[in-house]
């Protein structure tokens, strides 16, 4: 290919008086990527038995989708409804304070005063939220069900517009003490419901 052909190719045109060999070489070189792409597509495609003469179907297996569960209890599997996961009580637990916001983060536990939720990260990326602090129009009660080696099992009863819901949450001792000092949980007595 001559210098004029190279310059003309950059300009996406053909210069005057180009030899026939230059034109054929340029055409073949232009079509080469398209032919290679078609051959690669044919290698990836597999013809299904009984479908001769039809378009070959691509049977490449797609990656398995990750199973995630919604937060709604009505659509959640029954086996994952009330499963409790203990909260880690290591020293790497982080506590942060800002204004009226109290957040206590551990490996699998998060409590937020402003958002009034308790979030526990479960296996498979499943996130569940419980409300403890009373919201407008909602009355929350919590009581200690039992004491564990590293904390408590707290039963939370929610009553909002006649709709009642009960949850049990495992909370670590240090996190429980923090909530009591900051007023997140105002009064909890053994086996006695108290307004939280």
UniProtKB/Swiss-Prot annotation:
Region (Disordered): 44-80
Domain of life: Bacteria
Name used for this protein in its record: Uncharacterized protein TP_0927
Native organism: Treponema pallidum (strain Nichols)
């Amino acid at each position: 290919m001559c210098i004029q052909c190279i310059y003309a190719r950059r300009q996406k045109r053909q210069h005057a008086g180009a030899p026939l060999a230059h034109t054929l070489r340029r055409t073949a070189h232009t079509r080469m990527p398209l032919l290679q792409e078609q051959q690669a597509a044919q290698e990836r495609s597999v013809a299904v038995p009984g479908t001769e003469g039809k378009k070959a179907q691509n049977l490449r297996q797609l990656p398995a989708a990750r199973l995630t569960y919604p937060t709604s209890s009505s659509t959640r599997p029954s086996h994952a409804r009330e499963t409790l996961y203990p909260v880690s009580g290591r020293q790497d637990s982080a506590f942060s304070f800002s204004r009226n916001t109290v957040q206590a983060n551990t490996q699998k536990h998060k409590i937020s005063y402003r958002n009034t939720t308790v979030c526990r990260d479960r296996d498979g990326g499943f996130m569940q939220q419980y409300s403890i602090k009373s919201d407008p129009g909602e009355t929350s009660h919590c009581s200690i069900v039992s004491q564990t080696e590293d904390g408590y099992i707290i039963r939370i009863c929610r009553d909002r517009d006649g709709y009642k819901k009960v949850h049990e949450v495992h909370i670590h001792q240090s996190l429980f003490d923090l909530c009591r000092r900051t007023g997140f949980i105002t009064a909890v007595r053994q086996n006695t419901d108290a307004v939280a």
